[in-house]
UniProtKB/Swiss-Prot annotation:
<dbReference type="InterPro" id="IPR047565">
    <property type="entry name" value="Alpha-macroglob_thiol-ester_cl"/>
</dbReference>
<dbReference type="Pfam" id="PF01835">
    <property type="entry name" value="MG2"/>
</dbReference>
<dbReference type="InterPro" id="IPR054587">
    <property type="entry name" value="CO4A-B_CUB_C"/>
</dbReference>
<dbReference type="GO" id="GO:0005615">
    <property type="term" value="C:extracellular space"/>
</dbReference>
<protein>
    <recommendedName>
        <fullName>Complement C4-A</fullName>
    </recommendedName>
</protein>
<feature type="disulfide bond">
    <location>
        <begin position="633"/>
        <end position="667"/>
    </location>
</feature>
<dbReference type="InterPro" id="IPR001599">
    <property type="entry name" value="Macroglobln_a2"/>
</dbReference>
<dbReference type="Pfam" id="PF07703">
    <property type="entry name" value="A2M_BRD"/>
</dbReference>
<dbReference type="InterPro" id="IPR001134">
    <property type="entry name" value="Netrin_domain"/>
</dbReference>
<dbReference type="InterPro" id="IPR018081">
    <property type="entry name" value="Anaphylatoxin_comp_syst"/>
</dbReference>
<dbReference type="InterPro" id="IPR001840">
    <property type="entry name" value="Anaphylatoxn_comp_syst_dom"/>
</dbReference>
<keyword id="KW-1015">Disulfide bond</keyword>
<dbReference type="GO" id="GO:0030424">
    <property type="term" value="C:axon"/>
</dbReference>
<keyword id="KW-0765">Sulfation</keyword>
<dbReference type="GO" id="GO:0045202">
    <property type="term" value="C:synapse"/>
</dbReference>
<dbReference type="Pfam" id="PF07677">
    <property type="entry name" value="A2M_recep"/>
</dbReference>
<feature type="glycosylation site" description="N-linked (GlcNAc...) asparagine">
    <location>
        <position position="1128"/>
    </location>
</feature>
C-alpha cells in the first residue's frame, strides 16, 4: 500500500512539474544592428490571478547591456506580448560587440524576479543567443544602361531605404569593382534625398568583362547591395538578329523523330524587317562552352519579310554526329549551339546572333519540389506543392502531374495514385490523407505524359514522444495575393484528451515577427490572416501549443503571388503610338502619393549587343532583396518544436529548451545526388582537342589552330611560345588546322543597284536635321504629386526606347514601374556612314541608303547641302532623282572632294512629299596633308641681366612644310612658374593632364593621371592658394585623382602587385611606384588601406638577404630603373623601393597593420645599410647616387651614411652660372645622348636635356631640400629644372615629369612668398600686314592671365624686350605638317609599313585569311553562291568582331593588309619599350580581331594595342636587332579615291624624340588611287589647281595684253620667272618640279633670284598639271610661305598662278606663230624692265 501511495505521489509531482509555469521567449534568430528587433514574451500555465512583471533587453555575452530595457506585464488572462528592442548604432562599440568579431553573438535576456521565486530558476534571468549582423535597411543600385564601351561614362543611382522600405537619409559607401574583381573606386557620400546620383568613367584600357557597383550604409558592412554591368567594345547595331527554336529543348530519346527547327528573324531596331541573307552554322557545346562544329548542317537562306526558317531532319543530324563519333546517348548535358550572320542587302551591314541555351534533354520539363514539406503529420492531410517549368525556365501551364505516394507503416506499404494539372503559372498543389499509423512517405512525382520528368522525395513523420502532432492545412492551397484573407486550419492530432485551451501562432516576414496571437481550441480551429504588403513576398505561419509540458509546433511557408509594389507608379506615353525623331513626347507619370520619380530611357539596341544579361531593376529584384531578410530555411515543419522554430528563423527559449545558436545568415544546403554522365563524349567532341586533357594544353591547341593576320609558318609561331609544355600542342594543332584550310577559295557576286526619277517636293527648311544619337537619355529625378505630365524632345535615333521609372515615397516606399516602350521611326528615312577621317583633296564616295516603309513608291530628290570646303556635283544643288520602291531600300552614290583644311559639317537631304523626306547632319573629319611636326624652344627671361633684356627669336624655315597649311608659332610667357605649372589646367584638369604627356600608355604611364594632380593639390594646399583659382578647380582635381586611381587598378594583380600589362608578370619597380602614389592619394580616393598593405607585403617579399631588392620582371624600359646596368641598377631599384615604402607607412594602422609597419621599418633599415655600403664604395653613377642620397635623407638614415651619399652626389654635379644639374657620367647606359652645350648668352634658348638628366637632377633637388632647405644649391638646381619644361609644363616622359614636378613643388613650397614682382614683355614681329606688337604686363601672383599665349607667323622673326624685376619664361611651340620625313633620324630605329591588296595577300599566303562571312550580298540572295566551307563558318566568331564583314561585293577591293616591320641598329643600347603609331589610310579601320590575335595568343607578337581614330598603336616590349614584322587587316567601309600617303612613327616610349618617321602609300594600281569624281565635281576639286596654257598651239594672240592684265591687275603677281624644268619628284600629296631660272621678270621677297639658280614649284597630286622635264615655262604668281633646304623660297602652283609653256625656236619660225611669239617676247621684255605701272 505504501508503495502505491508513493507511486501516486511521484506521478502527481511529475505531472505538476510538466505543467509548471513557464516564460516563453521568441525572437528572430538574427539581430540587425540599428534596426528594431521584435521580441515575443508569453506566460504559460500560470495560476489565475498571478501577474508577472519583468523586462527584456540585449546584452554582450561577456556582460554589459547593448539596448534599453523594455518592460512587460503578463497574467493568465493577458498572457503574451510583442515588444521591440534595438541596438543603437552609437552603442555598438561601447557595449563591446566589435570585440566579438569571431563569435558575433548577442544575448536576448528576459529578467524578472518571478523566474526565481515562482518558476524555480536559479537566477531571475532567462535568455537565448542571437546572431548579430551589421546589415540594415534596403539598398538598390541602378545604372543608366546595361553595357558600356571602355572609356564611357557610367551614370548610376543608389536608392536608400530603411527596414520598412521607407526613404532613409544616411552616409553611403560606394565601391566599384572591375572585371577581375579588383576594387577601383571607393567613396563615401551623404544622401539627403534617399536617391544618390553619381558618375564615373570606365578606363579606356579596361578589358572586357562584368563590372560591379556596390553600395552600403557606411556603418553597415553587411548591408551591401550591388548591380552588374558589362564592359566590352561594341557598335550599336542597325538591326537585331534573333534565333528562335520551335522548342526550347531537343529530346534525345531514340524514338523521337521530330525535326530540329528554328526561325531566324532580323528586324531593324525601329521594328521593320530586314532584307538580306542569313548564314547559319551549328555546333555541340559542353558545360565549359567548348564547341565542336557539326559539318554538313551549315545553311544560307534568303530573308522574306525579315524571316527565314531552318529545318534539320533526324537523318541529317545523325549524319553530322556520325562524322565526329558521337551517339545520341552521349548528348545528355550538352547543348546545340547555333550562330547566324545576317547581311542586309541595301547597305551590306552585318549583324550576328547566337543561341547557346538549346539543351539536349530526356524530358521537356523541370520539376521543383522544394516547397513540399519534409515532415508529415499522421492522421492529417499531406500537401504536395510542385512547380513545373519548361526547359527554357518559363512556367509550364496545364501539364499533368502524377503523384504515386507510397505510404509506409512499419513493414507494410500502400501505393496511391493521384494526378492534377498545373495552373497558369506552373504550380500544382495536391492534398491526400495520411492514415494515423503511417510513419513515412515515398513520393514518385512525374510531370508530362509522353517524356515525363521524374522526381523522388522521401518524407518522414517526426517522432511523437507521446505529445501528438499539430496539423496546419490551408483552406485554399493556392498562393494568396496581397489583399486576400488566407485561412488556415489547425488541428491537434494523436492526443486523446488535449489539455490545452488555445493555439498560439506567429507570423514571421522580412526577418521580424509581424504578429503574435492566439486562437481558442476547437475540433477544427481556423485562423484568418489578412495578407498585406508587409508580408510580401513570403511569410512563415508558425503555430504551437503545450501538451504535458512539452511544446508541439508546426510551420508553413506561404509564398504570395507576385504583384505590383505597395504604392503605385505608372508611366504612360500620351498620344501617338509611334513618334518621329525630334518630336516632342508627352510622358504621363502617375503615383498614389507624393514621391520622387527617377527616370531613364535606354536604347533597346543595347540589349542586342549583350545587355540582356544584366536586366534593369524591376519589382522581382526588389522582392528578392526584401525576401533576403527572411532568415527561415525550408518549406516549414521539423522533427520537434525547437527545430520548427529554428527553421522558421526564430530563436526560442522556455527555460528548459532552446533553439541552437545560429552560425551564419545562410541556410544549410540540401545535398543533391547527381547522375554520372558518360564522359566518353569528351574524346569524341574533337579529334584534335581530345588529345589533350589539361585546360592549359587545350588552350595552347586552340591558339595554334587560330589563324594569324600575317604569314608565319607553324614552326615560326611555335618558336615564340615561351612555355615548353605549351609548344608541342600548339605546333601540332597549328599544322592540323593549316592542312584543313589550305585550298579554300571564295567567289563573289556584284551587288546590283538601281536609281530612278521625279516628284513634288517640300521645302528643305521644313525637314528636320538629325544630329543627336545618344545611347540613353531622360536621366532625371522628377518630384510628382499624384500626377505629372512631362514634355520632352526625343533624340534623333531611329530606334525603340525603353523608359524606366523608380519612385520613392515617404508613405509607400519604393516602386518600380513596368517599362514603357516608345518606337521612334520614320517610314521614310536615310542612313549615312562616314569614314573616321579623310585628307584634303581625297575623293570620297558617300553611299546613303534610303529606306521606304510606306505603301507607295516614292520619288525623291537627294542632295548634299552646299558647304564651303566641299566640292559636290552642281556645287551641291544638283540632286539625284530616285524612285524608292515601297517596302524596300535603295543606296545612292555621291562623290565629294574636301578642299578645306578644317572639319566640314556635311548635311544630306532627301526631299519628297511630307512623309518622304529626311535629313542627316554629320561632321566630316578632315586631316591635313603630310604628317604633324612639333618643335619646342624655351627662353629664360631675366630683366635684371643687361644682356638678357633684348632677344630675337628667328622664324622657322623648314623646307618640308606643307604649303597652304596652318603653320604658326605659339608663344607663351609667364612670370609665375609655380602657378603656371601647378595651378593651371595642365595639372588640374583631365584635358590638361592629357596634354602634359601626349603618349598613350601602360600601367606606369597611367600614373600620370594621378601624380601631377597630387603634386599640384599638395602645393596649393600648403601655400593656401586654392582661393586664387576658380571655385570648382579643387573638385576637378579630386575627380581627376579618382579617375587615375580607377585606371591604375586595371593593372593590379590579386596579390597586390602591378605589372606593365595584365598579361605581364609583376614588377618590383612598378609596384613600388604605385604604392608611393596611391599612398599619397589615400585621402582623395578613399582606397582601402588593406589593399595597399597587400602591395607593401608583396614588395617586402622581393627583398634579398643583403638588403637589396630584386625585380622578377623588370619594367619594359630598363633605363628608367636607374639609368645604369649592373650594380647601379640594383642600387637605384632598392632606393626607389625604400622611398615608396616610406611614403606607404601612413597606411599602416592598428591590429595586423602594426606588425606590418614594424616589418616595413625593419626592411627600410636593412635596405639603407645596403645603400650606404654602395655609396661608400664610390662607384655609383649620377642617377643611382642621386636617388640613394634622397632615400637615405628621406628615411633619416644614420648621419654617416647620409654624408657619404651627399658627398658622392655633389662630386658629380655640373655647375654653369646660375644652374646646377647632374648629367652624363661614366657607366651610363644612355651613351647616345650628348651633353647640351652651355648657353653662350642669355639671349639664346635653353638647351634641352634628356629625360635621365632631368630625373637625376630632380632627385638631387629633393635631397638638397631635405638636407639644407632652400639654399643656393637648391636654387640653382630648381632654376635648371624650371627651364627644362615643355610648352605644356611637362618634361620628356613619365618618370622625369613625375619626379621633377614633385621636386619643384617642394622647392616652391619652401620658397613661397607674398612679395609681388612684375614683368613687362614686349613682342613685335613683321608680317604681311606690317609690324605686329604685343605688350604683356605679368606678375608672379597672377591666376587669371597668369600666362599669355600669342600666335605669330611661322617664318617671322620675333623681337622680345624684357623689363621689370621678376624673372620669367618664354616658351615657343611650332606645329606644322611636313611633306616628307627626310629630316627625322632613322639611323637607330627603323620602321617600314607596306599595304597590299587583300586578294594579293591571300594568294601569296596560300590560304584565305578572310575567313567566315566574307560573302557577297546581292539584291537577289536566291542567286546561287559558292557555299561557305564548314571550317570557315565555324571559325567565324573567333576571327571577326561585329561590323568587320565586307558590306558589298566590290568592297573586297577596299580591304587591305598591313605589314609593319621594325628593327634597330645593333650598336644601339636600346632595350626598352617602343610604340609603332600607324596612321591608317583614309577611310580605313583596323580589324580588331586581327589585332587581338597579335596580343592574346600563346605566340604573342605585340604587348598591347590601342586604336584612336585613324591611329593604330602597337606596343613592343623591345625593338629587335633583326627585322621583325607583324600584320593585320583593314577595311574601308566608305569608298575613298586618290588616297594620299599616311605616316607611321616608331619611337622609344621613354624618349619620344628618339624616333623614326616614314610615309607609306596605298598599293600601286589599286582602286584606292583611282578617280571617283566626274564632271563638275572634278572641276570644283581642281578649281584651286593651276592650268597650263599653250597659247601658241591654240593660236591665241595677245592683242589685249592679257598676260600684263593677269600680272598687274587681276592678281598683281609677286614673282615672275621663265624656268626650265629639271626633274619631277613626289612627296606626300605633292609633286615637286625642280626648275632652273632662265630669266627673272619680277620678284618681291625672292631677292636672291638670278639666272641659273634653281627653285622648287609644287603642285598637288590631285591636280592634273604635269610639267615636262627639259621644257621651258613662264610662271607668275604669289610668293610662297615655305623655303627649301637652302633657304630659297618655294612656290605653290594654284589657280592664281600663270603657267605657260614657252614655244620652241622652231615653232616661232613658222609663219602662223611668228606674231604670237613677238607678243610673248615683248611682254617678257616690258615686264622684266618696267614691271607693273600701277
Amino acid at each position: 500500500m505504501r508503495l502505491l501511495w508513493g507511486l501516486a505521489w511521484v506521478f502527481s509531482f511529475c505531472a505538476s512539474s510538466l505543467q509548471k509555469p513557464r516564460l516563453l521567449l521568441f525572437s528572430p534568430s538574427v539581430v540587425n544592428l540599428g534596426t528594431p528587433l521584435s521580441v515575443g514574451v508569453q506566460l504559460l500555465d500560470a495560476p489565475p490571478g498571478q501577474e508577472v512583471k519583468g523586462s527584456v533587453f540585449l546584452r554582450n555575452p561577456k556582460g554589459g547591456s547593448c539596448s534599453p530595457k523594455k518592460d512587460f506585464k503578463l497574467s493568465s488572462g493577458d498572457d503574451f506580448v510583442l515588444l521591440s528592442l534595438e541596438v543603437p548604432l552609437e552603442d555598438v562599440r561601447s557595449c563591446g560587440l566589435f570585440d566579438l568579431r569571431r563569435a558575433p553573438y548577442i544575448q536576448l535576456v528576459a529578467q524578472s524576479p518571478w523566474l526565481r521565486n515562482t518558476a524555480f530558476k536559479a537566477t531571475e534571468t532567462q535568455g537565448v543567443n542571437l546572431l548579430y549582423s551589421s546589415r540594415r535597411g534596403h539598398i538598390f543600385v541602378q545604372t543608366d544602361q546595361p553595357i558600356y564601351n571602355p572609356g564611357q561614362r557610367v551614370r548610376y543611382r543608389v536608392f536608400a531605404l530603411d527596414q520598412k522600405m521607407r526613404p532613409s537619409t544616411d552616409f553611403l559607401t560606394i565601391t566599384v569593382e572591375n572585371s577581375h574583381g579588383l576594387r577601383v573606386l571607393k567613396k563615401e557620400i551623404f544622401t539627403s534625398t534617399s536617391i544618390l546620383q553619381d558618375t564615373f568613367t570606365i578606363p579606356d584600357i579596361s578589358e572586357p568583362g562584368t563590372w560591379k557597383i556596390s553600395a552600403r550604409f557606411s556603418d553597415g558592412l553587411e548591408s551591401n547591395r550591388s548591380t552588374h554591368f558589362e564592359v566590352k567594345k561594341y557598335v550599336l547595331p542597325n538591326f537585331e538578329v534573333k534565333i528562335t527554336p520551335w522548342k526550347p529543348y531537343i529530346l534525345m530519346v531514340p524514338s523521337n523523330s521530330d525535326e530540329i527547327q528554328l526561325d531566324i528573324q532580323a528586324r531593324y531596331i525601329y521594328g521593320k524587317p530586314v532584307q538580306g541573307v542569313a548564314y547559319t552554322r551549328f555546333a555541340l557545346m559542353d558545360e565549359q562552352g567548348k564547341r565542336t562544329f557539326l559539318r554538313g548542317l551549315e545553311t544560307q537562306a534568303k530573308l522574306v519579310e525579315g524571316r527565314t526558317h531552318i529545318s534539320i531532319s533526324k537523318d541529317q543530324f545523325q549524319a553530322a554526329l556520325d562524322k565526329i563519333n558521337i551517339g545520341v546517348r552521349d548528348l545528355e548535358g550538352l547543348r546545340l549551339y547555333a550562330a547566324t550572320a545576317v547581311i542586309e542587302s541595301p547597305g551590306g551591314e552585318m549583324e550576328e546572333a547566337e543561341l547557346t541555351s538549346w539543351r539536349f534533354v530526356s524530358s521537356a520539363f523541370s520539376l521543383d519540389l522544394s516547397r513540399t514539406k519534409r515532415h508529415l503529420v499522421p492522421g492529417a492531410h499531406f500537401l504536395l506543392q510542385a512547380l513545373v517549368r519548361e526547359i527554357s525556365g518559363s512556367e509550364a501551364s496545364n501539364v499533368i502531374v502524377k503523384v504515386s505516394p507510397t505510404l509506409v507503416s512499419g513493414s507494410d506499404s500502400q501505393v496511391l495514385n493521384v494526378q492534377q494539372s498545373t495552373n497558369r503559372i506552373g504550380q500544382v498543389s495536391i492534398s491526400f490523407p495520411i492514415p494515423p499509423t503511417v510513419t513515412g512517405l515515398r513520393l514518385l512525382v512525374s510531370a508530362g505524359s509522353l517524356y515525363p520528368m521524374i522526381a523522388r522525395l522521401t518524407v518522414q513523420s517526426p517522432p511523437s514522444r507521446g505529445t501528438g502532432f499539430l496539423s496546419i492545412e490551408p483552406l485554399d492551397p493556392r498562393s494568396p495575393r496581397v489583399g486576400d484573407t488566407f485561412i488556415l486550419n489547425l488541428q491537434a492530432v494523436g492526443i486523446p484528451a488535449p489539455t490545452f485551451s488555445h493555439y498560439y501562432y506567429m507570423i514571421i516576414s522580412r526577418g521580424q515577427i509581424m504578429a503574435m496571437s492566439r486562437e481558442a481550441r476547437r475540433t477544427v480551429t481556423s485562423v484568418s490572416v489578412l495578407v498585406d504588403h508587409q508580408l510580401a513576398p513570403s511569410f512563415y505561419f508558425v503555430a504551437y501549443f503545450y501538451h504535458q509540458g512539452h511544446p508541439v509546433a508546426n510551420s508553413l511557408l506561404i509564398n504570395i503571388q507576385p504583384r505590383d509594389c505597395e504604392g503605385k507608379l505608372q508611366l504612360k506615353v500620351v498620344g501617338a503610338k509611334e513618334y518621329h525623331n525630334g518630336d516632342m513626347m508627352k510622358l504621363r507619370i502617375q503615383t498614389d502619393s507624393k514621391a520622387l520619380v527617377a527616370l531613364g530611357a535606354v536604347d533597346t539596341a543595347l540589349y542586342a549587343v549583350g545587355g540582356w544579361s544584366h536586366k534593369p531593376l524591376d519589382m522581382s529584384k526588389v522582392f528578392e532583396v526584401i525576401n533576403s531578410y527572411n532568415v527561415g530555411c525550408g518549406p516549414g515543419g521539423g522533427d520537434d518544436a525547437p527545430q520548427v522554430f529554428q527553421d522558421a528563423g526564430l530563436a526560442f527559449s522556455d527555460g528548459d529548451r532552446l533553439t541552437q545558436t545560429r552560425e551564419d545568415l545562410s541556410c544549410p544546403k540540401e545535398k543533391k545526388s547527381r547522375q554520372k554522365r558518360n564522359v566518353n563524349f569528351l574524346k569524341a567532341l574533337s579529334e584534335k582537342l581530345g588529345q589533350y586533357s589539361s585546360p592549359d594544353a587545350k588552350r595552347c591547341c586552340q591558339d595554334g589552330m587560330t589563324k594569324l593576320p600575317m604569314k608565319r609558318t607553324c614552326e615560326q609561331r611555335a618558336a615564340r611560345v615561351p612555355q615548353q609544355a605549351c609548344r608541342e600542342p600548339f605546333l601540332s594543332c597549328c599544322k592540323f588546322a593549316e592542312d584543313l584550310r589550305r585550298n579554300q577559295t571564295r567567289s563573289q557576286a556584284p551587288l546590283a543597284r538601281k536609281v530612278r526619277d521625279m516628284v513634288n517636293l517640300i521645302e528643305e527648311d521644313d525637314i528636320l536635321v538629325r544630329t543627336s544619337f545618344p545611347e540613353n537619355w531622360l536621366w532625371r529625378v522628377e518630384p510628382v504629386d499624384s500626377s505629372k505630365l512631362l514634355t520632352v524632345r526625343l533624340p534623333d535615333s531611329m530606334t525603340t526606347w525603353e523608359i524606366h521609372g523608380v519612385s520613392l515615397s515617404k508613405s509607400k516606399g519604393l516602386c518600380v514601374a513596368k517599362p514603357t516602350r516608345v518606337r521612334v521611326f520614320r517610314k521614310f528615312h536615310l542612313h549615312l556612314r562616314l569614314p573616321i577621317s579623310v585628307r584634303r583633296f581625297e575623293q570620297l564616295e558617300l553611299r546613303p541608303v534610303l529606306y521606304n516603309y510606306l505603301n507607295d513608291d516614292k520619288n525623291v530628290s537627294v542632295h548634299v547641302t552646299p558647304v564651303e570646303g566641299l566640292c559636290m556635283a552642281g556645287g551641291g544643288m544638283m540632286a539625284q532623282w530616285v524612285i524608292v520602291p515601297a517596302g524596300s531600300a535603295l543606296p545612292v552614290a555621291f562623290s565629294v572632294v574636301p578642299t578645306a583644311s578644317t572639319n566640314v559639317p556635311l548635311k544630306l537631304v532627301a526631299k519628297g512629299t511630307l512623309d518622304s523626306s529626311d535629313s542627316v547632319s554629320k561632321i566630316l573629319q578632315i586631316e591635313k596633308e603630310g604628317a604633324i611636326h612639333r618643335e619646342e624652344i624655351v627662353y629664360n627671361l631675366d630683366p635684371l641681366n643687361n644682356l638678357g633684356q633684348m632677344l630675337e627669336i628667328p622664324g622657322s624655315s623648314d623646307p618640308n612644310i606643307v604649303p597652304e597649311g596652318d603653320f604658326s608659332t605659339f608663344v607663351k610667357v609667364t612670370a609665375s612658374e609655380p602657378l603656371e605649372t601647378l595651378g593651371s589646367e595642365e595639372a588640374l584638369s583631365p584635358g590638361g593632364v592629357a596634354s602634359l604627356l601626349r603618349l598613350p600608355g601602360c600601367a606606369e604611364q597611367t600614373m600620370i593621371y594621378l601624380a601631377p594632380t597630387l603634386t599640384a593639390s599638395n602645393y596649393l594646399d600648403r601655400t593656401k592658394q586654392w582661393s586664387k583659382l576658380s571655385p570648382e578647380t579643387k573638385d576637378h582635381a579630386v575627380h581627376l585623382i579618382q579617375k587615375g586611381h580607377v585606371r591604375i587598378q586595371q593593372f593590379r594583380k590579386k596579390d597586390g602587385s602591378f605589372g606593365a600589362w595584365l598579361h605581364r608578370d609583376s614588377s618590383t619597380w612598378l609596384t613600388a611606384f604605385v604604392l608611393k602614389i596611391l599612398s599619397l592619394a589615400q585621402e582623395q580616393v578613399g582606397n582601402s588601406p588593406e589593399k595597399l598593405q597587400e602591395t607593401a607585403s608583396w614588395l617586402l617579399a622581393q627583398q634579398l638577404g643583403d638588403g637589396s631588392f630584386h625585380d622578377p620582371c623588370p619594367v619594359i624600359h630598363r633605363a628608367m630603373q636607374g639609368g645604369l646596368v649592373g650594380s647601379n641598377e640594383t642600387v637605384a631599384l632598392t632606393a626607389f623601393v625604400v622611398i615608396a615604402l616610406h611614403h606607404g607607412l601612413n597606411v599602416f594602422r592598428e591590429g595586423h597593420a602594426k606588425q606590418l609597419k614594424n616589418r616595413v621599418e625593419a626592411s627600410i633599415t636593412k635596405a639603407n645599410s645596403f645603400l650606404g655600403q654602395k655609396a661608400s664604395a664610390g662607384l655609383l653613377g649620377a642617377h643611382a647616387a642621386a636617388i640613394t642620397a634622397y632615400a637615405l635623407t628621406l628615411t633619416k638614415a644614420s648621419e654617416d651614411l647620409r654624408n657619404v651619399a651627399h658627398n658622392s652626389l655633389m662630386a658629380m654635379a655640373e655647375e654653369t652660372g646660375e644652374n646646377l644639374y647632374w648629367g652624363l657620367v661614366l657607366g651610363s647606359q644612355d651613351k647616345v645622348v650628348l651633353r647640351p652645350a652651355d648657353p653662350r648668352s642669355p639671349t639664346e634658348p635653353v638647351p634641352q636635356a634628356p629625360a635621365l638628366w632631368i630625373e637625376t637632377t630632380a632627385y638631387a633637388l629633393l635631397h638638397l631640400l631635405l638636407r639644407e632647405g632652400k639654399g643656393k644649391m637648391a636654387d640653382k638646381a630648381a632654376s635648371w629644372l624650371t627651364h627644362q619644361g615643355n610648352f605644356h609644363g611637362a618634361f620628356r616622359s613619365t618618370q622625369d615629369t613625375v619626379v621633377t614636378l614633385d621636386a619643384l613643388s617642394a622647392y616652391w613650397i619652401a620658397s613661397h612668398t607674398t612679395e609681388e614682382k612684375a614683368l613687362k614683355v614686349t613682342l613685335s614681329s613683321m608680317g604681311r600686314n606690317g609690324l605686329k606688337t604685343h605688350v604683356l604686363h605679368l606678375n608672379n601672383h597672377q591666376v587669371k592671365g597668369l600666362e599669355e599665349e600669342l600666335k605669330f607667323s611661322l617664318g617671322s622673326t620675333i623681337s622680345v624686350k624684357v623689363e621689370g624685376n621678376s624673372k620669367g619664361t618664354l616658351k615657343i611651340l611650332r606645329t606644322y605638317n611636313v611633306l616628307d620625313m627626310k629630316n627625322t633620324t632613322c639611323q637607330d630605329l627603323q620602321i617600314e609599313v607596306k599595304v597590299t591588296d587583300a586578294v594579293e595577300y591571300a594568294w601569296s599566303a596560300y590560304e584565305d585569311y578572310e575567313d567566315d562571312y566574307n560573302m557577297p550580298a546581292t539584291d537577289d540572295p536566291s542567286v546561287p553562291l559558292q557555299p561557305v566551307t564548314p571550317l570557315q563558318l565555324f571559325e567565324g566568331r573567333r576571327s571577326r568582331r561585329r561590323r568587320e564583314a565586307p558590306k558589298v561585293a566590290e568592297e573586297r577591293e577596299s580591304r587591305v593588309h598591313y605589314t609593319v616591320c621594325i628593327w634597330r641598329n645593333g650598336k644601339l643600347g636600346l632595350s626598352g619599350m617602343a610604340i609603332a603609331d600607324i596612321t591608317l589610310l583614309s577611310g580605313f579601320h583596323a580589324l580588331r580581331a586581327d589585332l587581338e590575335k597579335l596580343t592574346s595568343l600563346s605566340d604573342r607578337y605585340v604587348s598591347h594595342f590601342e586604336t584612336d581614330g585613324p591611329h593604330v598603336l602597337l606596343y613592343f616590349d623591345s625593338v629587335p636587332t633583326t627585322r621583325e614584322c607583324v600584320g593585320f587587316g583593314a577595311s574601308q567601309e566608305v569608298v575613298v579615291g586618290l588616297v594620299q600617303p599616311a605616316s607611321a612613327v616608331l619611337y622609344d616610349y621613354y624618349s619620344p624624340d628618339h624616333k623614326c618617321s616614314v610615309f607609306y602609300a596605298a598599293p600601286t594600281k589599286s582602286q584606292l588611287l583611282a578617280t571617283l569624281c566626274s564632271g563638275d565635281v572634278c572641276q570644283c576639286a581642281e578649281g584651286k589647281c593651276p592650268r597650263l596654257l599653250r597659247s601658241l598651239e591654240r593660236r591665241v594672240e595677245d592683242k589685249d595684253g592679257y598676260r600684263m592684265r593677269f600680272a598687274c591687275y587681276y592678281h598683281q603677281v609677286e614673282y615672275g620667272f621663265t624656268v626650265k624644268v629639271l626633274r619631277e619628284d613626289g612627296r606626300a600629296a605633292f609633286r615637286f618640279f625642280e626648275s632652273k631660272i632662265t630669266q627673272v621678270l619680277h620678284f618681291r621677297t625672292d631677292t636672291m633670284a638670278s639666272i641659273g639658280q634653281t627653285r622648287n614649284f609644287l603642285s598637288r597630286t590631285s591636280c592634273r598639271l604635269r610639267l615636262e622635264p627639259n621644257k621651258e615655262y613662264l610662271i607668275m604668281g604669289m610668293d610662297g610661305e615655305t623655303s627649301d633646304n637652302k633657304g630659297d623660297p618655294q612656290y605653290l602652283l594654284d589657280s592664281n598662278t600663270w603657267i605657260e609653256e614657252m614655244p620652241s625656236e622652231q615653232m616661232c619660225k613658222s609663219t602662223r606663230h611668228r606674231a604670237a611669239c613677238f607678243q610673248l617676247k615683248d611682254f617678257l621684255m616690258e615686264f622684266s624692265s618696267r614691271g607693273c605701272q600701277v
